[in-house]
């Protein structure tokens, strides 16, 4: 989005125009998935939406969890954070497994792409899980939408727009609320609304400090 200072593509570029067209098609496929609620409808929607909307961004060479950074997959790993490999190495040491009571046969993985692929081929990733939140909010369960401006994968603008359109008991209050800077021992850059969302300024995935 051009309203995000970290946008990857120029608004008038061919890439953006293609993304707009793909977004419209993705929305239609998602509607069919939501209506039919079947693998036959949801898997094609999932594959098309992820491929057409995330594909161009993946080709830029930036870290999609923090677009201010470049990503060298050979050096930084599949998900652009070498720390994840370090954690895997530590947790797969026999001594650590023994202390934690983990069987030798189990290998720890920071992110299991095989499981990810299985979710994708069930069409789960494209289904509207927001339906599950509405009754929780009505029952008084608190929800915090927490996003970093520089995170492409969990896009702050998209999350905010979703929160403002999401039908729930706080819908009117959230839309009428104003964004106010949040201070916690100094300015944080976050601008929460009283009823709902927090966008963490200048941060990446999970608003990871120093990302």
Regions found by a protein language model. Give the residues of each.
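Terminal and linker regions of secretory-pathway proteins
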Residues: 1-211
């Amino acid at each position: 989005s051009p309203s995000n200072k970290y946008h990857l593509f120029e608004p008038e570029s061919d890439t953006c125009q293609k993304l707009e067209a793909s977004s419209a098609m993705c929305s239609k496929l998602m509607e069919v998935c939501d209506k039919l609620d079947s693998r036959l409808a949801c898997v094609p929607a999932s594959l098309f939406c992820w491929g057409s909307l995330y594909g161009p961004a993946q080709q830029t060479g930036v870290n999609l969890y923090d677009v201010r950074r470049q990503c060298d997959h050979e050096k930084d790993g599949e998900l652009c954070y070498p720390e994840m490999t370090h954690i895997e190495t530590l947790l797969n040491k026999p001594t650590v497994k023994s202390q934690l009571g983990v069987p030798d046969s189990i290998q720890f993985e920071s992110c299991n792409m095989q499981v990810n692929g299985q979710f994708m081929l069930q069409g789960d990733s494209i289904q509207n899980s927001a339906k599950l939140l509405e009754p929780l909010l009505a029952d008084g369960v608190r929800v915090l939408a927490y996003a970093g401006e520089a995170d492409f994968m969990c896009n702050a603008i998209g999350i905010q727009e979703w929160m403002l359109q999401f039908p729930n008991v706080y819908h009117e209050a959230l839309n009428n609320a104003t964004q106010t800077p949040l201070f916690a021992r100094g300015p944080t850059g976050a601008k929460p609304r009283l009823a709902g969302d927090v966008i963490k300024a200048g941060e990446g995935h999970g608003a990871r400090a120093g990302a």
